[in-house]
Amino acid sequence: IKSAKKVELKKDDGEIIDIQGKNIIIATGAKSRILPNLPQDGKKIIGYREAMTLNSQPKKIIIVGSGAIGIEFAYFYNTMGSEVTIIEYQDRLVPQEDKEISKALETNFKKNGIKIFTSSELINSKINGKSVSAIIKTANKEQTLNADIILSAVGVKSNIDNIGLEDVGIVSDNDKIIVDDFYQTNIPGYFAIGD
């Protein structure tokens, strides 16, 4: 993003061109948030994008995080027949939702065979050839869980690094571009939408 409502683009052949418009829409999407103790390799420890395009169904999957992304994939893989385990740092599933919703969801998931560890911290993860392990700390003890894949579902991070926001003066806070009710940034003619 450049000033004077210009965007610099790099074409497939390497040529760099400037495009100018009356308004600029910033819609750069998001990527999986990466935990230091859960580095994603895209094969055994994956993010939400890889979880949508696996070549084969895992027999066992550990899902770290129980927000919207984690819960959706837990339901999906359980329905497809995978053995699903959820690890959640907070004291309940979907901690942003009402407690009644969390309780009903947990009851339903357990009834369908999903294993749930709440108030549990992921200490470490390790790839062991064809399998992967997660070392977790619960209220009572440390234990190791094994699976074919670990899905990191601990949130998303906006793709706004190094795109020129600072050069133009567009304000961001906590990885989010600040917008008004019409999605316009603090700089007239620049809008931000999506993740």
Short names for language-model regions:
Residues I34-P36, I71-E72, Y77, N159-N162:
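Glycine/Thr-rich phosphate-binding loops of Rossmann-like dinucleotide-binding domains
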Residues E15-D18, A27-S32, L105-I116:
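Helical element adjacent to the flavin cofactor pocket in flavoenzyme catalytic cores
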Residues K11, G29-A30, T138, L151, ...:
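Short glycine-/small-residue-rich Rossmann-like dinucleotide-binding loops
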